[in-house]
């Protein structure tokens, strides 16, 4: 989608939201005029809230590690992506609630690699990792 401003066409920037949760990042990006390509999260309740907040967004409710390269390319329609945003789970790195558990054993700690994998496939102009 393009916008016009005083006779000048301004291209709408787009984004992908990984580990989207209820959509906090998407809300901010939507408010400044970005267009959502797709968002993904595995948590059912988060996805339910996201769908409520963004009924017109393409939401994938799936384990991000199961998202294939071909699925990603299909979701982006092989077009350029301006920015990938996301916040992989960090609870496994926190000392809070991890008494008696080694952070290295928490499978959530590997999810940042999925963010990197998707960035490598899509090659966006920018990324924002929280």
Feature annotation, model-predicted:
Residues 1-130:
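Conserved active-site and SAM-binding loop architecture
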């Amino acid at each position: 989608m393009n916008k016009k401003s005083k006779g000048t066409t301004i291209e709408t920037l787009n984004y992908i939201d990984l580990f989207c949760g209820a959509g906090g990042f998407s809300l901010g990006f939507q408010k400044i005029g970005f267009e959502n390509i797709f968002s993904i999260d595995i948590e059912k309740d988060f996805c339910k809230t996201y769908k409520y907040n963004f009924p017109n967004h393409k939401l994938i409710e799936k384990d991000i590690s199961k998202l294939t390269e071909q699925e990603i390319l299909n979701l982006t329609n092989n077009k350029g992506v301006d920015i990938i945003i996301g916040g992989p789970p960090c609870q496994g790195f926190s000392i809070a609630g991890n008494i008696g558990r080694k952070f290295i054993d928490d499978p959530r700690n590997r999810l940042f690699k999925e963010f990197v994998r998707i960035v490598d496939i899509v090659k966006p102009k920018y990324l924002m990792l929280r």
